[in-house]
Every structure is written in C-alpha cells, then in structure tokens.
C-alpha cells in the first residue's frame, strides 16, 4: 500500500503506552559524501541482522506545487512504481519480492520518500531499481500511463477523503489555518479539478524539475561494507545528470488573529471536534515542548484530556493531540469524538477548562516524566529498525533534510530531555490560546 501522510509526525506520542525508556548513549555512526551530480549520500553500518535499507528522499512535496497544479508530488509517488527504461511495468515489485524484499513510498508537504528493505545480498538490486527510476522514468512514462494513475489517485481521494467518515476534516483544516497563497493550504493528494486539468506536459515538467540527484538524498544502511556500498552507489547513480538549480519554497506569513469556527455535516454517527493552532516550525524553539504538551494532554489513558473526557465525565469516545511539525510552520491539533447523546460544544468546554488549568499552573513532575518516557520509547523503537518508515535510514534522511546534518540523534533526544514543567505551561500560554485558533465541528447529517 502506498501511504500519503498529510501530517507526518516524527513522534506519534498519542499512540504509545507509557514506560521507562533506556538512557543509553545515542550512537549512529555514518559516512557522508556527495556525488559530482549533487546527490547527497549517507552510509550507515548495522550488522545486527543481514538486511539492507535503501532510502531516498526527494526534496519535493506538495509545498513545491502551484495553485491550479496540485497533487503532482503524490501522483509521482504512484508513477515511480510503474516501470522505467530497464524495469518493465509491474517488475519493480516482483523483482524485489523475488529477492525477499519490500518497498513503499509516502508524500507530505515537504518531501517524498521511497524505502526499500532487502536481504543484504540483494543490495545491488535495490540500488539498480532506485537509480533506474531516478534516471529513466520518463523514458517509459506515456500519457496513457499518467491517465491510469491519475484515475487511481482520484479514486484514492474519494475513498480516503470524500467518502470516508470525517474524511474532509484535514482538508478543511488546512484551508482554515493557512492563508491564501501559503503552500500548506492545498492538500497533498491535490484538488480533483487540478488532477483532471493536468496535462501530460505539466507532469513531465514537474518530474524534470524536482526528481534529480541534486534535489535528493540517498541513505544506504544495514549489513553493508562501506567501500563496497560506495562503489555501488557510484556505479548506479554517478552518471545521472543534475537537474536545474532550485530556490527554497517561499511562504507568506501565517498567523491567526481570532477564532475561526466552522461546522460541517457528514454521514457520521457521532459529533467530532477539531481544535487547531499554528505553532513553530520543526526543530524550532518550542517544537519539542509542544510534543510534550500533546502527551500531557492526550498521550495515553492517564493523560489529562483522556481521564477527564473519557473516564470521568464519559462524554467522549476518544481524544488525541499532536504537534504536526513541518518546515514552513506547524499545527497543533486536538481531536475528540463525542459519545452518543453529547455534543462537540460540551467537548470544547471541557478541553478549554483543561487548557486553562495548564495555563495557570504547570503539570506535575510525574506527568512530564511520563510524557518524556513515551517520547523516548518511540525514539528508541525507531532506532531498533534499520529500514522502513521511521527506521534509522529514514531518520538519517529526515535529520539531513530538516537540519542540514544526519548527525542529530543525540541532539534530538536532548531537546526533549530539556523540556520542563514550566516550559509546558509556557507553551500552552503562548501557543494554545482560546482566542486565536480554528474550531471545526463535524456533526451527523447529510454530507455537504
């Protein structure tokens, strides 16, 4: 399954059970070099098990698109698996499966990534496949192929958003939170009318602009030999020509000056409330502390909102909170689903009471400790895996894209360990005010 993440979180704290995390040093040794064509390459050896991961990040996401031409980055997430010059249509998956490997891809606002996990002895196959679609995808990409995948994406949009209960919420929130002209305002999957209007030449031009070695980063990790891996990378990627030089995405200032309220009716059984705020960009001051805030509020059954809404008052079926971090700005989101007979307004009132309480007095030390334990547990679980989404290969690329260096594991952990109860209180005061946010309610009724 090809997954697309509109809100990609480095740490999904709300889904973790609390528990003590290890305090061992963070050590992810790597070698880094750059090919003449601009491809950034990161090698990491982990011989714990005989597997290898090939992880490519293209520094292009939906934020690189233009109004009227949305959904292209996600469309290529599909097209990249449909064959290239030396790999026939359908062969990408079958070759990897025959070798005992698997693969996937995802798209968000800032990047598109592709992951391949194989037995270590199939590393060369994985590098060949990845390089062939970088270099030669357009050699076999026909208008008919684009039309076929365009229809697949349209159907995905219908299934995942338009015809799914509460499915339009994330699209509505983006339009309510971000100002006109901001590249986070349109959905990663694209608008239906843009997908329909896109010409074959438009699609080709997008690939030619962004899917080039100088706009990508490659991680090879696992049971590898550094010199042999470098030789394979140079063999398969070294002759791919550079693409055009790109300028960073620009965005207008984003700020909320009041409360924006909207109610949608949908074919749902229960009301659901979404509260959203604009917050600091990823890795900026406050970003880590807001992850901790989300865990204090809704990270597990002992969290404040879960205890109050689900256990004590029994007016909610579920509640979650998270800091959705991204390069040009982030959003903090609280989502709660009412129990039968209760309303979104009731949920809103209780959530505001708990936010006010955190604004008046900091959380107890044990609450912060529990939140940090959840975050560290998630961090170390990712480090236990070489490949896949969120494994070490993926995280090396993530750190490189966000901070300019892969060497950020220890620094990342340190920024969470530095969060105090006073900092949690300060973040709620500064970034989660009741008078500057978006309030979206989805209630039962005819879908509109």
Functional labels for PLM-detected ranges:
Residues 138, 180, 213, 217-281, ...:
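An aromatic/glycine/proline-enriched structural segment found at the starts
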Residues 26-29:
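Short, small/polar residue-rich loop motifs at catalytic or cofactor-binding pockets
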Residues 31-36, 262-266:
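Short acidic-hydrophobic surface loop/beta-edge motif
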Residues 44, 49-65, 71-75, 89-136, ...:
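M16 family metallopeptidases and their MPP-like homologs
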Residues 4-16:
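Bacterial N-terminal signal peptides
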Residues 19-22:
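Boundary at the C-terminal end of the N-terminal hydrophobic targeting segment
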Residues 70-84:
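Active-site SXXK
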């Amino acid at each position: 399954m090809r997954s697309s993440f509109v809100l990609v979180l480095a740490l999904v704290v709300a889904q973790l059970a609390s528990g003590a995390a290890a305090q061992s040093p963070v050590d992810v040794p790597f070698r880094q070099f750059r090919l003449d064509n601009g491809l950034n390459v990161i090698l990491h050896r982990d011989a714990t098990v005989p597997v290898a991961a090939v992880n490519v990040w293209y520094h292009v996401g939906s934020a690189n698109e233009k109004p009227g031409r949305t959904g292209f980055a996600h469309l290529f997430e599909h097209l990249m698996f449909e064959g290239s010059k030396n790999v026939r249509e359908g062969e990408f998956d079958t070759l990897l499966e025959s070798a005992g490997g698997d693969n996937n891809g995802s798209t968000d606002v800032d990047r598109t990534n592709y992951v391949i996990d194989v037995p270590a002895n199939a590393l060369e196959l994985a590098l060949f496949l990845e390089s062939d679609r970088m270099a030669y995808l357009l050699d076999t990409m026909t208008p008919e192929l684009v039309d076929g995948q365009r229809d697949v994406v349209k159907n995905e949009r219908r299934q995942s958003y338009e015809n799914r209960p509460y499915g339009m919420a994330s699209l509505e929130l983006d339009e309510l939170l971000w100002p006109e002209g901001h590249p986070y305002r349109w959905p990663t999957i694209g608008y239906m009318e843009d997908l329909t209007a896109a010409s074959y030449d438009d699609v080709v031009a997008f690939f030619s602009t962004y899917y080039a070695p100088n706009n990508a980063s490659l991680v090879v990790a696992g049971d590898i030999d550094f010199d042999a891996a470098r030789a394979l990378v140079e063999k398969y990627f070294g002759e791919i020509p550079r693409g055009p030089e790109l300028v960073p995405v620009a965005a207008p200032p984003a700020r909320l000056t009041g409360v924006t309220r909207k109610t949608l009716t949908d074919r749902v059984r229960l009301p659901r409330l979404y509260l959203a705020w604009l917050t600091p960009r990823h890795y900026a001051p406050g970003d880590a502390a807001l992850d901790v805030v989300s865990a204090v509020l809704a990270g597990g059954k002992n969290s404040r909102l879960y205890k109050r809404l689900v256990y004590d008052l029994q007016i909610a079926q579920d509640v979650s909170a998270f800091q959705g971090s991204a390069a040009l700005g982030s959003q903090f989101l609280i989502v709660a689903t009412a129990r039968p007979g209760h309303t979104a307004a009731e949920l809103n009132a209780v959530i505001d009471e708990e936010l006010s309480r955190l604004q008046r007095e900091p959380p107890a030390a044990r609450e912060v400790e529990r939140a940090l334990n959840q975050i560290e547990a998630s961090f170390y679980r990712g480090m236990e895996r070489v490949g896949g989404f969120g494994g070490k290969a993926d995280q090396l690329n993530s750190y490189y894209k966000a901070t300019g260096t892969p060497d950020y594991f220890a620094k990342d952990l340190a920024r969470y360990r530095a969060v105090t109860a006073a900092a949690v209180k300060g973040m709620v005061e500064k970034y989660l005010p009741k008078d500057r946010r978006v309030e979206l309610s989805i209630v039962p009724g005819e879908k509109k």
